[in-house]
Structures are given as C-alpha cells and as structure tokens.
Amino acid sequence: MTTIVPTPSPSPHPDPAQAVASPDEIVRNPIEGVPMPLSHRVSLSAIWTVVRITVARQGRGIRLLILAVLFSLPIVIAVLTRRFQDPYQPESAEGALILGLIFQALLPVSALLFASGMVQDDIEEQTLTYFLIRPIPRWAIYLAKLLGTFVVTAMRALVFTIATLVTIYWGEDGLIKPVLTERAPIIVALVALSLSAYVAIFGGLSLWVRRTLVFGAIYIVVFEGVFANIDFVIREATVMYHVRVLAVRWLDMPGADWSIDLSTAPAASTCLIVLLTVSTVFAAFGALTFGMREFRVKTPEGS
C-alpha cells in the first residue's frame, strides 16, 4: 500500500521574522530593493545652489536700484567738492565721504535693505518650500542665504566705494601709490568687516521682529549714529566704533574727529576679534532661529 504524503503549500501569512532581512543581508544586498539609509553629510553642491539662487535673486529688483542711487551720492559730492572747494583737500574729502557718509550711513542701510528680505522674499514669492524640502539642514540653508546676501551687498558697495576713492584723488600725484596700492586694500577689508557684521545683525533681526526696516533704521540712527559718536563706554558696543579705530590705526585718519585716543583705544587685534565675533554670534543665532521656526508659506490659493 502506497502512502501519499501531501506537499506543504506556502503559508499566505509568512513569518515576519523570516520575511525581514537581517542587517547583514541589507549590507550585502544593497540593490535588491532594500532602502538605503540617507547620508547625514551636508551636500556642498546643494549649499552652493542655494548661494547662487540667493545671489541671482538679490542681484535684481528695486533694492539694487536704490543701492545704486545711494552709493552714487558720494561720487557726485566728490565731483562737486573738487569743482568748488578752493583749495581742494582730498584727505578731508576722503574722511568725510568714505569714513563718514559711506561707512556710517550707506553700508548699514544697504545691509538692512538686502538682509531684511533675505527670508521674507522667499516667503512672498512662495519659493521657501523648495529650499526646505531639499536634503539640506535648515541651519545650512540660512547660512548659505546669508553668504549670498553678503556677497551681493559687498560687491556693489566695494565697486562704488573704490569709485568714490578714485574720484576724490583723481589727478593727484598719489592716486596710484599710495591710494590704490595701499589705502584701497585696507578700505576693502574695512568694508567687508562692516558688512559681515551688519548683514548678520539685520539677517537675524528679520527673523525676530516683524517690521525689520523700522527697527533696523532705529538701530542705525541710535546705535551706529548717536552712540558711536558719544565718548562713553556704550560706543564700544557699536560696529562703527571698532571700524573707526581700525581706520585710525591702519589709515592714519585723525582720531580727534571721533574722540578716539589711540593710547586708550582698543588694539587692532581686539577690534578684529570683536567684529568677527559679532558676525559669528548673530549668524549662529539666526541659523538656530531659522532651524526651529515654523514658517507660514503662502500658496497660490492664498492659504
């Protein structure tokens, strides 16, 4: 008599322990439809893309036109001064236009105009979502946008500042040396230091207050305008004071005009540390705020 043994059919509900591959199998078989873990490294190419988009966006629009008009004023004033001042004194014109008008007014105003819209423009144009869904940490997105804003502001400011310097010393014996070969690089460094601090300050301010332009204008007038000119300890909390100390030490500007006594003023290294620390701290707090904040992004339907 023959005994027939039935062949067992596969269970419709397999054992989960048998269905799930072990970690070793996942590593050995990465191409068999098993999801691979995402890398936690920051993509430099993705960050560079954010920087390029920010530069392209900040390089157009009414802000750029306003910046061009504002920075044309020192050039026009320099031309008029050369025409009507008798005798013409280029050193005094440099102090009034470069260290006075540009550094005390135009640089902080230009930083405010661009940094205040650094994030808000993406919200208004409904493009912030495209940044947030990319595989980039939020803090890296903010720092990339901050870098792009600084590049745009600094490049425009440097072009007009050097143009003003050339206009002031045009036709003078020292135009090439020492003006363009010695003084101009120092002025470029001071512009970069000033804007790095101002862009970081106003970039963070745009995340902390609603009316950034109003509060930024108040800061410029009160702190960088009034407090920086008062011979009291509070002026050491301003960007303008440390920039002026560097200008007095590096450019031999007359410190008496700003009540700066080099025997009691901070050393150049101290001023550099203060300016770089301000830039770093405000950039870090801005990145932290951007990383934790929930944004109400507008949609085409208005929701």
Functional labels for PLM-detected ranges:
Residues T2-V20, D24-I26, T81-E94, W208, ...:
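Terminal transmembrane helical anchor/hairpin motif
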Residues I26-L67:
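Aromatic- and glycine-rich beta-strand/loop motifs that create alpha-glucan
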Residues V27-L38, V69-M118, Y142-W208, T212, ...:
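Secretory targeting signals
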Residues L44-W48, R52-G59, A140, E182, ...:
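Membrane-interacting alpha-helical segments
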Residues V51, G117-F150, T299:
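Helix-loop-helix units of permease transmembrane domains in multi-pass membrane transporters
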Residues A56-R57, Q120, F131-I133, F202, ...:
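Helix-capping/transition residues at the boundaries of transmembrane alpha-helices
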Residues L65, W139, T212-V214:
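Residues that define the loop-to-transmembrane-helix transition and helix capping
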